[in-house]
Amino acid sequence: VAGTQVKHYRDLAFMGFWEVITNLRTILRNIDFCKKDITQFNPDVLIFIDYPGFNMRIAQWAKQQHIPTHYYISPQIWAWKENRIKAIKRDVDFMYVILPFEKDFYEREHQYRVHFVGHPLLDAIAQRKEVDEQTFKKENNLDVRPIIALLPGSRKQEIAKMLKIMLSIVDDFHQYQFVIAGAPSIDYHFYKRFIKEENVHFVSGKTYDLLSVSYAALVTSGTATLETALLNVPEVVCYKGNWISYHIAKRIIKLKYISLVNLIMDKPVVTELIQGDLTKKNLEAELNKLTTYRHRYEVFKDYVLLRERLGGEGASEKTASLILRQCQEN
C-alpha cells in the first residue's frame, strides 16, 4: 500500500563515528530487514531520501537486483569521503540535489549529471500558518519580553550537552525570555532536569511557530540552522560533540563552515561556535551582537540573498515529476 510506514527513520539514525560503531549490530540488522522488505514489495523503482550511510548500502544491493534507483537529497560527499562518488556513479541512476553548489560539484568536478530542484524547506516554511506573537505568548504562558529561542537538537545525547551551555547564559539576559524548542519524539520530563532558571520556558512541536516570533536564536548545527535563517531569525550556531567523534571528523572533513547558511553563502553570515569555542563567555558575546541594529541589518540582507540562491518552491514536486518522467520514458 502506498505510503505505508514499515519502520521510522528515527529508529535507524545514529550520528557520529563512535555512535555508529557502538550500534553497528543494530544497523546491520536493519539493512537486512530493509532488503527483505523491498524484495517482498518488488518495486518498479526505488527512491532514496537522504540518510546516505544506510541508503547507499541498499542502493548497491538494489542495482544488483536491477531495480532503477533515484536519490533525492544527495549524500554530502562534498564535505567528506568524496571517494563515494564512485559508488554514486555506479549505483544511483538519477540524483536530485537541493543545495545550489552541489550541481557544480557533481557536474564540473565529477562529470556526473544531477538535477538541482531547490530546497524543500522553502515549501515547509511557505505552507505554515502565520502566527500572531501576542497570541503565541499568551497560549504558552509567556510575558511581553522578546524571545530568545533555544534549539538544542533532536537526540538526547546532543540535547543534554547543548542545553547545559545554552542555559548557562540565561541569568545575564533578564531583558529577554528563553524558550526551548522541544523535539517531538522527546517528552518534557527529559528537558525538565536541565531547567533550573525561572526565565526558561518550553514548547514542543512548535519550532516554526516559536522561531517566527523570536528575536534571536541559539541553534545546534544541522538543518535547523537553515530553518532559522529562512524564518528570518538572527542566530548563533552551536556545536559540541563527542570528543572522539569530533577529532576524527576534524581530520577528514574539509569544510570552511559547518552551518548550511554559511556553506550556501560561502561566507560567515552567522557565527559558528564549535567545540572548544562554545563557551559561556563567547556565547554571551555573540548573543549580545545579535541584539544590535547594525548587526541585525547585515544578517537580514544576507538572508534575502540566501533565499534567492536556494531557488523557488516546489522541490519535492519537481523531483516527483522528474522521477515520473523517467519511469514513463523507460
Regions found by a protein language model. Give the residues of each.
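Nucleotide-activated sugar donor-binding and catalytic core shared by glycosyltransferases
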Residues: 1-330
